[in-house]
Amino acid sequence: TGIPLIVHTRSAETETLELLKRKKLEKDFKILIHCFTGSRDFAFKLLDLNAFISASGVVTFKKSHELASTFKDIPNNRILVETDSPYLAPVPLRGKTNEPSYIIHTVKFLSELKKISFKEFSKITTNNFFELFGELN
């Protein structure tokens, strides 16, 4: 159908990889890893499957150093951003009910982490969205 498989996984990295690898052998499809909070190793194994990996506000949290480091090294053409509203509001709004307008804080954090402009990173993630989902006509 061309519609990507959207995966939310926690504490099941091995099982998720095994399932995705097995299914990709049967038929190729696009993958989006929603609200990624997994390990660096897991991220790069997902990238080997050409997955897109989405960052939520969690990446901005003070205790998310390892996650931030992982996103710093994920190729720009494989990153998306999301709010996961109404949960996981980014710093500086952590603890509040999340909403779509708060995504700018996650984009700002990641653009600074990757040392590129907010505008450029916004363009990159928008292009990634259309690469994954198509033009949505």
Mark where each language-model region is:
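Catalytic metal-binding/acid-base residues of hydrolase active sites
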Residues: 10, 52, 86
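His/Asp/Glu-enriched short active-site or ligand-binding loop at hydrolase and phosphoryl-transfer sites
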Residues: 50-64
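Divalent metal-binding pocket/active-site signature
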Residues: 1-49, 62, 69-70, 74, ...
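Non-cysteine beta-strand/loop elements that form the S-adenosyl-L-methionine
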Residues: 34, 77-85
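Mid-to-C-terminal alpha-helical segments outside catalytic/metal-binding sites
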Residues: 101-137
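Short, conserved catalytic or interaction motifs in soluble domains
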Residues: 76, 90, 111
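Active-site phosphate/pyrophosphate- and oxyanion-stabilizing loops and adjacent acidic/basic residues
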Residues: 68-69, 108
